[in-house]
């Protein structure tokens, strides 16, 4: 018979409600993670960047690195897909309902500078320590002062072996002394980051120039 008992119907309804609430919670978690856009690994064109090991990226999307509190650094010139890949991993983490937060490096530095002025350094470190996965995008576009660099180091040191951090940068580690205004602080930051870290170097062409030849002479 197609008839089901009242208790079975109620159970199915309850399961459906749980699924709905779980799905809604996942979507909310993605929304509050502050991603500038939502792109997954399936949206990434690995054919355009063939030097990237796709299986290595897929492994990062499995979030195994978070189990060991390891970090990820995407390093390469502007436009090669560093931010896209970082967001892909972040969306996977947020979908798994792991506390995730995305922030641009310059925005974070501005917040740290404000915290220093208001003598709230410990508060801001605790705030960004709480996320299971913190994604810091675009290190290296603007140099920062030594005092701000030191608070950033304290944040990285606080997260070391406790939480996972993903960073994207257009500068090799050898130039981080210039970025952070101090070679000693830069070395200390790098030391904490790379001890347990997957470093992905991307040297391909910019996606933003895909299909365009900016060196063509435009004679009007």
PLM regions and their residue ranges:
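Interdomain "pre-motor" coupling segment immediately N-terminal to P-loop NTPase/helicase cores
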Residues: 1-37
């Amino acid at each position: 018979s197609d008839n089901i008992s009242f208790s079975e119907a109620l159970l199915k309804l309850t399961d459906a409600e749980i699924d709905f609430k779980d799905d809604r919670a996942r979507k909310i978690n993605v929304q509050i993670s502050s991603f500038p856009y939502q792109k997954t690994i399936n949206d990434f064109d690995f054919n355009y960047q063939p030097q990237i090991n796709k299986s290595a990226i897929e492994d990062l999307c499995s979030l195994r690195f978070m189990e060991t509190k390891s970090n990820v650094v995407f390093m390469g010139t502007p436009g090669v897909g560093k931010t896209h890949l970082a967001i892909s991993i972040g969306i996977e983490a947020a979908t798994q309902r792991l506390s995730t937060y995305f922030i641009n490096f310059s925005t974070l530095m501005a917040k740290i500078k404000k915290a220093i002025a208001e003598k709230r350094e410990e508060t801001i470190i605790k705030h960004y320590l709480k996320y299971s996965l913190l994604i810091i995008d675009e290190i290296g576009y603007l140099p920062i002062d030594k005092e701000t660099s030191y608070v950033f180091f304290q944040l990285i040191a606080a997260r070391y072996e406790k939480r996972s951090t993903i960073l994207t940068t257009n500068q090799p580690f050898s130039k981080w002394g210039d970025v952070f205004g101090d070679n000693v602080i830069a070395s200390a930051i790098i030391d904490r980051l790379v001890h347990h870290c997957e470093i992905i170097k991307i040297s391909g062409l910019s996606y933003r120039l895909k299909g365009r030849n900016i060196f063509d002479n435009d004679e009007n």
